[in-house]
């Protein structure tokens, strides 16, 4: 496992400004999310070379390429962990914040955008349904469309209330989609 200095700086900064005690719950939810991916891969017999955690997310390095069905199952495992935890925590006294954190993390990761789990799920489903070439084209188009809609919503929210969080997230996703396309040679 490799943890970047950028992640450590971001974690320290977020923890410093966290007055509500939410950051430890977010960190735990993210850890369990990644553990869901790792356990799914291990259960399917896929060797994982490294887990790299950076300021912009976590990335698993595998020893080889995955088939579409294997990648689909592995991509679904992380959000599934968060959604199950959200349901469970919502029934526990004092668990509403943890439930909310897990619900938001699970649903966010299901957005059909590039490197997010939802983007990987969509790519795999489309590759199996209409073939890899057309599947990747459609998934890339939907990623760009989704980021554009989030960016427009972010601008609208910023204009209405002065909160730029959604716009910042959409810009991060735009960079992620751009990098994802370059790595795949698109």
Language-model regions, residue ranges each:
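Hydrophobic transmembrane alpha-helices and their immediate loop junctions
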Residues: 1-186
């Amino acid at each position: 496992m490799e943890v970047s200095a950028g992640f450590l700086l971001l974690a320290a900064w977020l923890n410093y400004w966290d007055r509500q005690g939410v950051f430890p719950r977010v960190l735990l939810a993210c850890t369990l999310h990644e553990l869901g991916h790792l356990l799914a891969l291990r259960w399917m017999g896929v060797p994982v070379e490294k887990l790299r955690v950076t300021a912009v997310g976590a990335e698993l390095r595998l020893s080889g390429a995955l088939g579409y069905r294997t990648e689909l199952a592995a991509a679904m495992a992380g959000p599934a962990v968060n959604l199950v935890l959200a349901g469970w925590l919502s029934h526990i006294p004092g668990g509403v914040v943890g439930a909310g954190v897990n619900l938001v993390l699970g649903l966010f990761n299901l957005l059909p955008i590039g490197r997010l789990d939802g983007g990987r799920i969509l790519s795999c489903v489309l590759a199996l349904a209409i073939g890899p070439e057309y599947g990747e084209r459609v998934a890339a188009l939907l990623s760009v469309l989704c980021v554009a809609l989030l960016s427009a919503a972010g601008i609208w929210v910023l204009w209405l209330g002065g909160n730029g969080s959604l716009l910042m997230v959409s810009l991060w996703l735009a960079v992620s989609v751009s990098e994802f396309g370059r790595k795949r040679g698109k």
